Structures are given as structure tokens and as C-alpha cells.
A protein has these predicted regions:
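Conserved PDZ fold ligand-binding element
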Residues: 51, 257-281
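Serine-dependent protease modules
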Residues: 1-237, 243-244, 253, 283, ...
């Protein structure tokens, strides 16, 4: 019974309201806007509740509010994010949550997306269009689907369960109520009507764990690479005949990048054993490294394969 599955999962799903401030026209005044997304409870420590979501849900937020299944809300802060994986972890202080709410919420049970079969039934739960938690059903239409966005490519699960704006960061669960994907509504295009996408939990779990375990680097002790670069997305890559990744436009003199032999015109595709496709993603990966840390950088050079 779908209603019983949803009843068991809903206490682990949250809504996320982000408030953003932008400068008004001609630089006058400040305009405030709101965004809606979803997340799910990943872990609980003595002091904090850890919540997983998509990076694009929280990346431009000045403040975040989490709504729990019982209707209560609490302020949240960003723990960390991986822009390339479009994943983030935010936290809510336990002291800001009532005992009544703490007694109702649950930590999500993670499944195994690698074991999924095409045609298997799934349920998507999230804060669709910002109107509150909603439920849609469908099947796994495809696995390992390469999907191109304006800022890179991701390998996703495809489903015919409706995943609308606001659903991003919510859960895609199997008939056991186990999370097998993280809904992603970045792709909004009339040509893909009837297709929803989710980040496989097998992919996401490693990234989310790394984010939670990342050591805070004191100001001034962060690593520094020394390049100026531009994200080379699939559209630019195809038009210019340049590989997708970070196109290096300039290398700072005497920087670690110059000493390592990185040159203008190179395209960076990997950092420390992980693929990287955007400048934002590269910056987020560098930011959790201490100065002096040695890392492997994968790149492609004209007339070479990298």
C-alpha cells in the first residue's frame, strides 16, 4: 500500500525555504526573493540534525528555513556542498527543535540504487512547487542516463514519476521505503515532459559523507591553485571543439598551478581523483584542502588525451 510506505517515509523528508537578496535595478535597493526545495534527514549528532539536499537549492541563499513533517520550522545553516555533484548538507541545531518534533522525525533509510531494475516501482516525495509535501508515483525508466545541464553533465536515474520545481532534494524511494535517489528538478524543458531525474543514492552517499566529514580549514590556511578559468559546458564544448571541463584562461605566475605545469588552454577534468566540470565545483573542492596538500589534477591539452 503506497499510503503506508509514504507514512513511514514522510517524517524523514523536509521542505527547505531559501531567502535570497539581490541588488535592485541600476544598483539601487535590495530585493528579497524566496526559493523552495526539499531535503531529507541524513544523520543526527548530539548537537545537530544533518539534512541532505541539492546544491542548487541552497547555493544562493542568505538564510534557510527547514519545515518538518509536523509543520514546525527551524533555521538551518550550510555544512558544505559539492557543486559538480549538485549535493549539499545543511544542519539544524537540536536545541532549536522541540522535543515533540524530535519524537516524530526519522532518519531516512538508504537503499541500494545499484540493485534497481528498470520497470521497478518508485515514489517521489518532495515540496513540489513550494506548496508543501506531495507524493507522485512511477517506475524506473532508465539507469545511468547521461543528462546535460547548462553547467555540466550528470549520470542520473530516469523515472516517469513527476518531479517538479521544489521537489529538488527530496527523496525517490523504492517499495520498501528506502531512499534510492535524490530528486533533481534542474532540468526544466518542454522537450522532457514526463521524465524526472534523480541522483542515484550510491553516487550521492559517498559525496554526502565526505561533506559531513570535511575538516574546517582556518581562514588563510586554505589551499590555492592559481588559475583563472571558465566552465566549458556541453554547448560550448561542442561549438568550439574543446573538451568539457574547466578551460584555463590564465595561470598566475609562480602559483602551484604554474609549478605543476598547468598552462593556459588546458581543460581541467579531474581533481583529487574526482571528476570536476565547473569552476564553482573546482573552487568547492579546493576550499576543503589545506595549503601544501598534494593532489592529482587531470587535464586535457590540445592534441592530447590528458
Amino acid at each position: 500500500d503506497i499510503s503506508q510506505i509514504v507514512e513511514g517515509v514522510m517524517p524523514s523528508v523536509v521542505s527547505i525555504t531559501s531567502k535570497m537578496q539581490t541588488t535592485g535595478f541600476y544598483g539601487f535597493g535590495v530585493q528579497e526573493s524566496e526559493g523552495a526545495g526539499s531535503g531529507f534527514i541524513l544523520a543526527k549528532t548530539d548537537d545537530n540534525l544533518m539534512i541532505a539536499t541539492n546544491n542548487h537549492v541552497i547555493s544562493e541563499a542568505n538564510s534557510l528555513t527547514v519545515g518538518f513533517s509536523d509543520g514546525s520550522t527551524a533555521e538551518a545553516t550550510i555544512v558544505g556542498a559539492d557543486a559538480d555533484a549538485d549535493l549539499a548538507v545543511i544542519s539544524v541545531k537540536i536545541k532549536d527543535i522541540s522535543d515533540e518534533t524530535l519524537g516524530k522525525i526519522k532518519i531516512a533509510v538508504l537503499g541500494d540504487s545499484d540493485d534497481l531494475q528498470v520497470g521497478e516501482s518508485v515514489i517521489a516525495i518532495g515540496n513540489a512547487l513550494g506548496y508543501g509535501q506531495s507524493v507522485t508515483t512511477g517506475v524506473i525508466s532508465a539507469k545511468n542516463r547521461e543528462v546535460s545541464f547548462t553547467d555540466g553533465t550528470m549520470t542520473l536515474l530516469q523515472t516517469d514519476a513527476a518531479i517538479n520545481p521544489g521537489n529538488s532534494g527530496g527523496v525517490l524511494v523504492d517499495v520498501e521505503g528506502h531512499v534510492i535517489g535524490i530528486n533533481n528538478a534542474k532540468l526544466e524543458d518542454t522537450s522532457v515532459e514526463g521524465m524526472g531525474y534523480a541522483i542515484p543514492i550510491a553516487t550521492a552517499q559517498t559525496v554526502l559523507t565526505d561533506i559531513m566529514n570535511a575538516k574546517t580549514i582556518p581562514a588563510g590556511e586554505n589551499a590555492y591553485l592559481g588559475i583563472i578559468g571558465k566552465t566549458m559546458d556541453a554547448q560550448y564544448s561542442s561549438a568550439l571543439g574543446i573538451p568539457s571541463g574547466i578551460y584555463v584562461t590564465q595561470v598566475v605566475k609562480d602559483s602551484p598551478a604554474e609549478k605543476a605545469g598547468i598552462a593556459a588552454g588546458d581543460v581541467i577534468t579531474g581533481f583529487d581523483g574526482n571528476s570536476v566540470s565547473t569552476m564553482e565545483g573546482l573552487k568547492s573542492k579546493i576550499s576543503v584542502k589545506e595549503a601544501g596538500t598534494k593532489v592529482k589534477i587531470t587535464l586535457k591539452r590540445a592534441n592530447q588525451n590528458g
